[in-house]
Design a protein with these regions (language model features):
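Mixed-charge (Asp/Glu-Lys/Arg
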Residues: 1-26, 31-128
Length: 128
């Protein structure tokens, strides 16, 4: 939850309107009004160098895990304090795992005040 709160705060500072999906099984955590379209965002956090990107589901006694698919979300926001990584789906090198060292160019320093005023432009199908 801490990662989600950090992302919400950052998006608020960038003046992005946002909503949380009513369906807890949705493949994204936030719906954000981007520059031209609504953008879906998946939020993760980790203290590991690499972690598996999986959707978790199931009931009280069982857990199921599924790999994310194209169309599940537009951007992946990954928190590893004091950094946040903002990666468009099309720029993910693998849909099943995330390795921080592979995404240094997508890293933003949460201890740098410029991070909160230099808005990242969120667009569908963003090309780098």
């Amino acid at each position: 939850m801490a990662g989600e709160e950090l992302v919400r705060y950052l998006l608020h500072m960038w003046n992005y309107p946002m909503c949380v999906p009513l369906d807890p099984s949705a493949p994204f955590d936030l719906l954000v009004k981007g520059e031209n379209d609504w953008i879906t965002i998946q939020i993760k956090h980790s203290i590991q160098k690499t972690f598996k990107l999986k959707r978790e589901g199931g009931g009280k006694n069982t857990r199921t895990y599924k790999t994310y698919q194209k169309g599940d979300f537009d951007y992946l926001f990954v928190c590893q304090f004091p950094y946040i990584y903002i990666v468009p789906w099309d720029h993910l090198k693998a849909a099943s795992c995330f390795t921080f060292s592979m995404y240094e160019s997508y890293r933003h320093d949460l201890t740098d005040e410029k991070t909160y005023v230099n808005k990242v432009i969120l667009e569908k199908g963003r090309k780098r």
